[in-house]
């Protein structure tokens, strides 16, 4: 099935199957809606395209997943921030888990039966991921994990966690596990953010026993896994977010009176151009994936462009809708506040620019 056939068939199916969100816009409601949408799309096979048959997929290029995400976002069927983890964690499981484990678990994620989380950042190890201290030690054929993670998205809803631990010194001493979040010794404490949604959490591991067959890859493969995962976190998982931001630009145009100030036209044009640039860059990433390329440091360009475009769009809304953010409780206010983190989550803008300078432009470390 080519992209045109897929998109037209998907649109016909969505037109005939109402998956619109209900009245509950709380985080609980958003997570339940995401599960509902994924389950319906999986049962109708749309969620299975672009994934390998070994994990219940129907094959085809990864761009089909991007098309699906765009349609979900354009119709407002699922909150974009929580939809994104599929494109981060499923490829990681396919690449690093035992084939039997991936075949068992990935359909649970794609089919909306489970939510997963990613346990990377720690209180003292955010951008400096290699300094993480959560420790895993072997004991009686299993591994015992002790430590703390923070900024773990949706941990309070997650059934599983892709977890980085330290098993030896240095980069080669980082090992990844696929951990059941209901295991004894795990405590989850949600964190309230300034936009009023407790989607992040800190997670404590107190002598948590993890079976040896839940290791992802081999001992010491955790750093390589992270380097393979993070490019997805900085590119493919944002395909649908670009479409979501276009809907917000459309809403801004609808709410504005007919512009009579050339400066307004310039601001709107600049916001559109920033989004168009991200979309063009994203299409290039999709083509590289379709050609079998492995994503790498070039995805930092995707992340920088997207973060800049998102903040520019909501800055434009603030400037052209005076008082809407400051004096009223509207979606504009919540999304503006959320956009402030766009240059932080998934690796700060400064880190991304350092990666671009050192690994793409070969400018050295100074």
Predicted regions and their residues:
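A structural signal for short hydrophobic beta-strand segments in well-ordered beta-sheet cores
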Residues: 134-137
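C-terminal helix-coil-helix/basic helical segment that borders enzyme active sites and/or dimer interfaces
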Residues: 22-28, 276-330
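Internal helix-loop-helix
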Residues: 43-107, 111-112, 154-160, 275, ...
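Glycine-rich beta->alpha junctions and the first turn(s) of the following alpha-helix
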Residues: 186-277, 342
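A short core secondary-structure module
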Residues: 142, 146-188
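A short, Trp-centered hydrophobic/proline-enriched beta-strand micro-motif
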Residues: 112-120
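Glycine-rich phosphate/cofactor-binding loops in nucleotide/flavin-utilizing enzymes
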Residues: 63, 67-68, 227, 321-366
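Amphipathic, small/basic residue-rich leader segments at the start of a protein or domain
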Residues: 1-82, 104, 108, 269, ...
């Amino acid at each position: 099935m080519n992209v045109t056939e897929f998109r037209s068939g998907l649109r016909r199916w969505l037109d005939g199957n109402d998956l619109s969100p209900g009245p509950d816009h709380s985080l609980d409601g958003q997570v339940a809606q995401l599960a509902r949408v994924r389950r319906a799309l999986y049962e109708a096979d749309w969620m299975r395209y672009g994934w390998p048959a070994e994990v219940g997929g129907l094959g085809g290029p990864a761009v089909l997943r991007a098309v699906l995400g765009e349609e979900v976002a354009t119709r407002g069927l699922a909150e974009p921030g929580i939809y994104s983890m599929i494109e981060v964690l499923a490829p990681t499981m396919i690449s690093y888990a035992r084939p039997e484990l991936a075949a068992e678990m990935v359909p649970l994620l794609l089919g909306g039966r489970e939510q997963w989380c990613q346990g990377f950042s720690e209180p003292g190890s955010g951008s400096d991921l290699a300094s993480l201290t959560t420790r895993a030690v072997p004991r009686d054929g299993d591994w015992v994990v002790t430590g703390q993670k923070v900024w773990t998205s949706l941990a309070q809803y997650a059934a599983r966690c892709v977890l980085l631990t330290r098993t030896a010194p240095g980069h080669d001493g980082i090992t990844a596990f696929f951990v059941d979040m209901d295991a004894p010794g795990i405590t989850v404490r949600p964190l309230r953010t300034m936009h009023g949604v407790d989607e992040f959490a800190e997670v404590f591991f107190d002598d948590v026993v993890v079976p040896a067959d839940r290791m992802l890859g081999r001992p010491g493969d955790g750093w390589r896994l992270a380097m393979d995962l993070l490019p997805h976190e900085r590119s493919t998982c944002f395909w649908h977010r670009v479409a979501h931001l276009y809907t917000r630009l459309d809403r801004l145009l609808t709410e504005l009176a007919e512009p009579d100030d050339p400066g307004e036209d310039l601001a709107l044009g600049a916001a559109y151009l920033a989004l168009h640039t991200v979309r063009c860059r994203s299409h290039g990433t999709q083509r590289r994936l379709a050609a079998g390329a492995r994503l790498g440091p070039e995805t930092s360009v995707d992340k920088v462009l997207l973060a800049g475009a998102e903040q520019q769009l909501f800055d434009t809304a603030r400037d052209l809708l005076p008082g809407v953010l400051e004096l009223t409780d509207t979606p504009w206010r919540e999304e503006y506040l959320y956009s402030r983190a766009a240059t932080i989550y998934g690796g700060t803008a400064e880190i991304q620019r350092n990666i671009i300078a050192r690994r793409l432009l070969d400018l050295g470390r100074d």
